[in-house]
From Swiss-Prot:
Transmembrane segments: none
PTM entry text: Tyrosine phosphorylated.
Species the sequence originates in: Mus musculus (Mouse)
Family stated for the protein in its record: Belongs to the class-I pyridine nucleotide-disulfide oxidoreductase family.
Protein name: Dihydrolipoyl dehydrogenase, mitochondrial
Cofactor requirement: FAD
Top-tier EC class: oxidoreductase
């Protein structure tokens, strides 16, 4: 016999009670009660609301899928928006302004300020307000696009089911046709060093220090290490980065660019110990930290004492306790989820994108994957050329690149030609009194096709997108050289470098 609750639900769906209430005075309909433990029905369930997850969720909803996005944290946006890309750019920008005002830069421009003081608390407030506005923006976009947001830790509990466990222990089950894992990454711990986010910090703690440390040691001179090291160096800290490799800027950076970049940072006061490894760190009774280092190849040990130790040795995929192994989805040796070219795991309706799959751990790479992944679910084509994904270091000057480096082309045996143009010869850079760096273009020797672009200088992060567009559409160096660029602009340096690559010489150098 059909239960009363099922009869009630059936009548409610048909609007039976509404018709009764309209027909009888004094009788009103009783709204159908929903229970937290009743499953939510979805077409697509996204686990994680970082750049890959939230973009995928919105695109999914725009394509007509009933979409749920599960996020374990209180705010949307993932690491990038809350404790990564966004807050770090606020501090990089504001610390650069302080550095200009506090040093000789403003005075050289005829701007004389008697006393420049740092209000770190206010600087942190501005960072927080930017983060708050953007996280709120995602919540608004979810509402606007009808994405259902479920707060809790998402775990796959069946090939068509995800269970979100909330902070209070309660659960919400989502029955879903497709599952998309976009859980991002977490800080890679350093063996033997415990991060307390007070004096031994990860990138998260480095974004919220209560005061400027007298001496800061950074383990790692990759992208995150030089960015956060730059922030505190500009604000007055004595900063030393210890790097195992023999160059700064991390994997993928062109070596000529890296060497010039290092020289500029050193001129600003940033110190580096390259080809050096950290063997341990000890907290002393006075609160300071002794960091033990030695040559990467082995040798005499040395101790560097600091007030704050920043650990920046990379990130690892956040793939534990997601229920993958229980379904037979095994991780690769680096903890990543194996997927095919449509981002499907070995279970076709379970997908993965972003930092949990192979490729660079970049927010914009995750965004692209999120969009094309759900387009693929809808039957569309799935294509991404990872050679066209740009990388940026947001120091001052900025560093940006896309495509192959000179070292990679040599290793692959590809014949190439080089075009360079210094910002010192660019009129806009001259008027801005900001002339460090250059643009370096790598073109195919016989076809002239652009193979790589490497930029060190002001606005490099914006300029590199022109290069990414050129690579995506297979442009030649001459194609770019023949595009009229507005004058005076920094982007003219990009055109001039392509002129040099295509014709052997630029115009203005």
């Amino acid at each position: 016999m059909q239960s009363w609750s099922r009869v009630y639900r059936s009548l409610a769906k048909k609007g039976h009670f509404n018709r009764i209430s309209h027909g009888l005075q004094g009788v009103s309909s009783v709204p159908l009660r929903t229970y937290a433990d009743q499953p939510i029905e979805a077409d697509v369930t996204v686990i994680g609301s970082g750049p890959g997850g939230y973009v995928a969720a919105i695109k999914s909803a725009q394509l007509g899928f009933k979409t749920v996005c599960i996020e374990k944290n209180e705010t949307l946006g993932g690491t990038c928006l809350n404790v990564g890309c966004i807050p770090s750019k606020a501090l990089l920008n504001n610390s650069h302004y302080y550095h200009m005002a506090h040093g000789k830069d403003f005075a050289s421009r005829g701007i004389e300020i008697p006393e420049v003081r740092l209000n770190l608390e206010k600087m942190m407030e501005q960072k927080h307000s930017a983060v708050k506005a953007l996280t709120g923006g995602i919540a608004h976009l979810f509402k606007q696009n009808k994405v259902v947001h479920v707060n809790g830790f998402g775990k796959i509990t069946g090939k068509n089911q995800v269970t979100a466990t909330k902070a209070d222990g309660s659960t919400q089950v989502i029955d879903t046709k497709n599952i998309l894992v976009a859980t991002g990454s977490e800080v890679t711990p350093f063996p033997g060093i415990t991060i307390d986010e007070d004096t031994i910090v990860s990138s998260t703690g480095a974004l919220s220090l209560k005061k400027v440390p007298e001496k800061l040691v950074v383990i790692g001179a990759g992208v995150i290490g030089v960015e956060l090291g730059s922030v505190w160096q500009r604000l007055g800290a004595d900063v030393t980065a210890v790097e195992f490799l023999g160059h700064v800027g991390g994997i993928g950076i062109d070596m000529e660019i890296s060497k010039n970049f290092q020289r500029i940072l050193q001129r600003q006061g940033f110190k580096f110990k390259l080809n050096t490894k950290v063997t341990g760190a000890t907290k002393k009774s006075d609160g300071k930290i002794d960091v033990s280092v030695e040559a990467a190849s082995g040798g005499k040990a040395e101790v560097i004492t600091c007030d704050v130790l920043l650990v920046c040795i990379g990130r690892r995929p956040f793939t534990q306790n997601l229920g993958l192994e229980e379904l037979g989805i095994e991780l690769d040796p680096k903890g990543r989820i194996p997927v095919n070219n449509r981002f499907q795991t070995k279970i076709p309706n379970i997908y993965a994108i972003g930092d949990v799959v192979a490729g660079p751990m970049l927010a914009h790479k995750a965004e692209d994957e999120g969009i094309i992944c759900v387009e693929g679910m809808a039957g569309g084509a799935v294509h991404i050329d990872y050679n066209c994904v740009p990388s940026v270091i947001y120091t001052h000057p900025e560093v940006a690149w896309v495509g192959k480096s000179e070292e990679q082309l040599k290793e692959e045996g590809i014949e190439f030609k080089i075009g360079k143009f210094p910002f010192a010869a660019n009129s806009r850079a001259k008027t801005n009194a900001d002339t460090d760096g250059m643009v370096k273009i790598l073109g195919h020797k016989s076809t002239d096709r652009v193979l790589g672009a490497h930029i060190l200088g002001p606005g490099a992060g914006e300029m590199v997108n022109e290069a990414a567009l050129a690579l995506e559409y297979g442009a030649s160096c001459e194609d770019i050289a023949r595009v009229c660029h507005a004058h005076p602009t920094l982007s003219e340096a990009f055109r001039e470098a392509n002129l040099a690559a295509a014709f052997g010489k630029p115009i203005n150098f």
